[in-house]
Amino acid sequence: MISLPLLLFVLLFSALLLCPSSSDDDGDAAGDELALLSFKSSLLYQGGQSLASWNTSGHGQHCTWVGVVCGRRRRRHPHRVVKLLLRSSNLSGIISPSLGNLSFLRELDLGDNYLSGEIPPELSRLSRLQLLELSDNSIQGSIPAAIGACTKLTSLDLSHNQLRGMIPREIGASLKHLSNLYLYKNGLSGEIPSALGNLTSLQEFDLSFNRLSGAIPSSLGQLSSLLTMNLGQNNLSGMIPNSIWNLSSLRAFSVRENKLGGMIPTNAFKTLHLLEVIDMGTNRFHGKIPASVANASHLTVIQIYGNLFSGIITSGFGRLRNLTELYLWRNLFQTREQDDWGFISDLTNCSKLQTLNLGENNLGGVLPNSFSNLSTSLSFLALELNKITGSIPKDIGNLIGLQHLYLCNNNFRGSLPSSLGRLKNLGILLAYENNLSGSIPLAIGNLTELNILLLGTNKFSGWIPYTLSNLTNLLSLGLSTNNLSGPIPSELFNIQTLSIMINVSKNNLEGSIPQEIGHLKNLVEFHAESNRLSGKIPNTLGDCQLLRYLYLQNNLLSGSIPSALGQLKGLETLDLSSNNLSGQIPTSLADITMLHSLNLSFNSFVGEVPTIGAFAAASGISIQGNAKLCGGIPDLHLPRCCPLLENRKHFPVLPISVSLAAALAILSSLYLLITWHKRTKKGAPSRTSMKGHPLVSYSQLVKATDGFAPTNLLGSGSFGSVYKGKLNIQDHVAVKVLKLENPKALKSFTAECEALRNMRHRNLVKIVTICSSIDNRGNDFKAIVYDFMPNGSLEDWIHPETNDQADQRHLNLHRRVTILLDVACALDYLHRHGPEPVVHCDIKSSNVLLDSDMVAHVGDFGLARILVDGTSLIQQSTSSMGFIGTIGYAAPEYGVGLIASTHGDIYSYGILVLEIVTGKRPTDSTFRPDLGLRQYVELGLHGRVTDVVDTKLILDSENWLNSTNNSPCRRITECIVWLLRLGLSCSQELPSSRTPTGDIIDELNAIKQNLSGLFPVCEGGSLEF
């Protein structure tokens, strides 16, 4: 027998042989720590505080770092990293190959960051990896085939990146345990590998929003555990394989927006008992919907719109008691006989139905009364673009849950049912282009949630009902092309929300345009053409500061064009033709830079036609039928304007000369008397100067600017003109002279003085002095004198007017980031660190000025607001100045009248960031109507980023590409992507979601640090701007 001591010795020795030494484990753990630190060093931006804890070292200290999870202490390898979870940590840079050394890693989640570069093939060494989550980044390149080596993967999410190339077949051949595969929103191409049919454990499968082509492999029918399959938004063709219809476990199936065709098999839904959602929209399917659809009793959403389905709509839908949404629009369904509408009676059994879209088919005949018996949960009912006749069911008001009702483009006749007034939740009512008649029911005024009401192109008669003034949420009103008469109700213009459109054109309306129209400060379109309107064009139209389209032609309007229309800086189209207007064309119209279509023809205008602005190109204006006009550009072929006394030989010269001399003498005496009276009344110039800014006299400014000579004019706006001048021998200054004839200019002057009274910051334009006096004609005179900025505005550098300027003015990426940092520091001071919080309200490239050292200074505080507790406006003198900011830069909440806040400045700053990176103005003429600068950049980030970046910055990167080392090029590209994402983050629609100034400064400093050394000092020691 073996003695007990000997037995214990053998057991202890065996244990020592089997267990690794602690020093070995410590060495492996140290390797994990090094791999993590290498990953951190590869990042351009480390997420602010996200990786702040990653700076301690020692035995197992890395296990305490944020996002790092190590094995349990009781296990054999307690300090080995098993999870790295850094989702939504604001990380930017590349994924370091060193992560492939974390050999015990089971979960890697880097989703929702700003990572770029390619997926390192070294990740294939992670043999224990079960979850790989890299979604919502900017990762490029292809999916490495080596990923197939991670054979224990159960979830692979690479969605929402910029991946290209084909899907590796190795995913299907090797990853047998995969249950979730998400590759959507990339740029993947080629065919779907048939090997993916081997993933028999797959439950979630999403390849949508790619460029995949070819047929759907029949092998996908082998995915017996599949719950969700999404192949939508690709270029797939052919038919849906029959094997797919046998996936009895399937709960959601989408192939929308492809090029698929063929018919749905008769027994397609026979085994799909668990199917809840099917989306086959926008393809080329044809034939009938099989009655077997009733077998899929769990169906809640059916989307088969945008195909070529035809015949009678099956009654099988009515047996789907869980159905909530049914989209059949844009097909070839028809109702030849009244019985063909029987499916509506069947659908009354679907008590959960919320959406029914039958628009754009060949449905005809009269609507059955059973429509009024559909579910009261129905919120969306669309019947537009069919051939439906007869009356609208009188009890349609029973559908009390309706929020959207589309009846337009049919042949409905009769009157609008008064029961519509019971639809208290209705937000959109479209009934235009029918044959409806009678009066518009007063009950429409009960629809207080209504946003859009379009009843145009019918046969309505009578007056516009005054009850429309109850629609306090209305955004758009269309009543055109009817037989309406009477005046336009003034109450209509008390609906402050009306902003998209008012169209009352082509009726028989009479009377004048109410002065109250000026209340609609956010209105974009006003159509009142082809009526019998008379009287003058109201001056108050100038208060509609967002107006872009104004149509008043073919009326009986008289008087002159109010100069206040020149305040509509966003106006694009103005048509006043065929009226009885007279007088001179106001020069203020020439100041509307956006105006590209101006029709003043067939009126009685006289005098000289301007030659600048909208009048500088004959293609955009029409003035025929005005016999007494003269001047203008040569292309208009108008007679030359004659001097007043050119034909003096026809008049008795001596009597007129004596009379004129006497009159001038009298006027001169009166003028001197009035001037003396004003001076004695007002005394010396006002001493209400800003604290610390002594006043300067009018005569000093006249001398400083050479009498405000045109050669010293730097620019002009609606509130004032800016001149270059010298107050003493050495100091150049910029003198802003207020146009006090504009009533808002004085408010601008007051706002600017109040905002900058106690402000001191290196990135704010400094006020040298002010002038509040009278000029040499005895009129009030106000001016603000600033430090002169010799390098002009940022706008001049980003958008040079000539090629010569473009060659001379080039800002490289480092300089652009520095300027953005300067502006961010200015905003941070205004919002958080000044004597009192100030909102600038007009951040844009033309208000960012550059000094001789290219340091940026924020200027023009004419719209600024001072806040109490950061939110409440106390600068009431500017509250009546109308729309806040500049179109394109102004925050969306300002468009609906919300109060100014620091969030609005952040939005404008975000747009400025996008402008400075793309070189595009926010209102660039190349943008489609539905595409703004934000959407333009978002498309670029989901495609080729270089397509949206300023070409000059691309050239900077290409200079590095020509070198032997392309690492700087990659760093530049990553910083550009980072900047674009920052701009999008700052300009989010929800104000509270926008990035605060402190975080902006942190990110810009990090970007600037990563760019350091890439843009060296040029010869002579001057920076390459």
From Swiss-Prot:
ATP binds at residues 714-722, 736. Its cofactor is Mn(2+); Mg(2+). Residues 24-653 are extracellular. This is Receptor kinase-like protein Xa21. SUPFAM superfamilies: L domain-like (SSF52058), Protein kinase-like (PK-like) (SSF56112), RNI-like (SSF52047). Binds to XB3, XB15 and XB24. Receptor kinase-like protein Xa21, processed: Interacts with WRKY62/XB10 in the nucleus. Glycans are attached at residues 55, 90, 101, 198, 235, 246, 295, 322, 349, 373, 435, 446, 470, 483, 503, 580, 599. It comes from Oryza sativa subsp. indica. Enzymatic activity is fifteen time stronger with Mn(2+) than with Mg(2+). GO terms for cellular component: endoplasmic reticulum membrane; nucleus; plasma membrane. Undergoes protein cleavage upon X.oryzae pv. oryzae protein Ax21 detection, thus releasing the processed protein kinase Xa21 chain. Keywords: ATP-binding, Cell membrane, Endoplasmic reticulum, Glycoprotein, Kinase, Leucine-rich repeat, Membrane, Nucleotide-binding, Nucleus, Phosphoprotein, Plant defense, Receptor, Repeat, Serine/threonine-protein kinase, Signal, Transferase, Transmembrane, Transmembrane helix. LRR repeats lie at residues 78-101, 102-126, 127-150, 152-174, 176-199, 200-223, 224-247, 248-271, 273-296, 298-319, 320-343, 350-373, 375-399, 400-423, 425-447, 448-470, 471-495, 497-520, 521-544, 545-568, 569-592, 594-617. Belongs to the protein kinase superfamily. Ser/Thr protein kinase family. Pfam families: LRR_1 (PF00560), LRR_8 (PF13855), LRRNT_2 (PF08263), Pkinase (PF00069). The keyword DNA damage does not apply. Changing residue 705 to A/E: Abolished autophosphorylation and loss of interactions with target proteins (e.g. WRKY62/XB10, XB3, XB15 and XB24). Loss of positive impact on innate immunity toward X.oryzae pv. oryzae (Xoo). It catalyses: L-seryl-[protein] + ATP = O-phospho-L-seryl-[protein] + ADP + H(+); L-threonyl-[protein] + ATP = O-phospho-L-threonyl-[protein] + ADP + H(+). Changing residue 697 to A/D: Slight reduction in autophosphorylation.
